[in-house]
Amino acid sequence: MNIVNTIKDVRLIIKKWKDENLSIGYVPTMGYLHEGHASLIKKAREENDKVIVSIFVNPIQFGPKEDYSTYPRDLVKDSSLCEKFGVDLIFNPETSEMYPNKIYSHINVDILTENLCGEKRPGHFQGVCTVLTKFFNILNPTKAYFGEKDAQQLAVVRKMVEDLNFPIEIIGCPIIREDDGLAKSSRNAYLNKQERKSALILNKSLKEALNALESEEKNSNNIKDIIVSKLNKEPLAKIDYVSIVDSITLQSVEKIQSPILVAIAVYIGKTRLIDNFTFKL
């Protein structure tokens, strides 16, 4: 397994693979890898001749009061996981390599970023789409793999790739959970013992919503009330948003008549966690 830090060096390797007509699976990450990332890597390994993982904590997708400086980093642990699951190359550029000068060009995806995390984290998806455009141009992958836990990100990236004619297939992979139901996340590392226990309220509230939907509740406000009521019973939980949107357009719905995404963002102490599920009628 190679670990490469420069665009020049990684492009030389990519060119060699492309000259040999090898397919490339790409897993973009910010590092501090866990079983959720491992599931993406395994899927990429099954479907491609070569697998690349990028590890880059992207400064332009963080807001001024967010956790860029404290985001967990552990390249040794990450490298071990990548090697275990058969990654061929880790691309781990410095910030100065990706952004050597002040950046004036940005990628925006409208409409799909109006709600959910796009509303609550202004500029976040502009940063995500801009850095992914750079990575797609640098690495030229055949397929790229994203977790469904970041459901809005997955929808936004799919639309960007479609609109800008990137010759890349975007693959969504299911949420990976702890045994007790908490969605795997690098930010779970921030939680102390009590917060970790309290964080289970996210999955529990979504399960109650799913039960109501399966009992044919069609009013989205009633579903949201169920989630909010459950979350408010946890003293350490502070709701950022509870949203029910069309699973394709990500626009809010009142009456549930088509597939929906039920998505929540909740602060447990100072840690912001997200979770979701898709419900198909």
From Swiss-Prot:
GO terms for molecular function: ATP binding; pantoate-beta-alanine ligase activity. It comes from the Bacteria. One of its GO terms (biological process) is pantothenate biosynthetic process. Its main location: cytoplasm. GO terms for cellular component: cytosol. The reaction proceeds by a bi uni uni bi ping pong mechanism. Homodimer. This is Pantothenate synthetase. It comes from Clostridium botulinum (strain Kyoto / Type A2). The lineage of its organism: Bacteria, Bacillati, Bacillota, Clostridia, Eubacteriales.
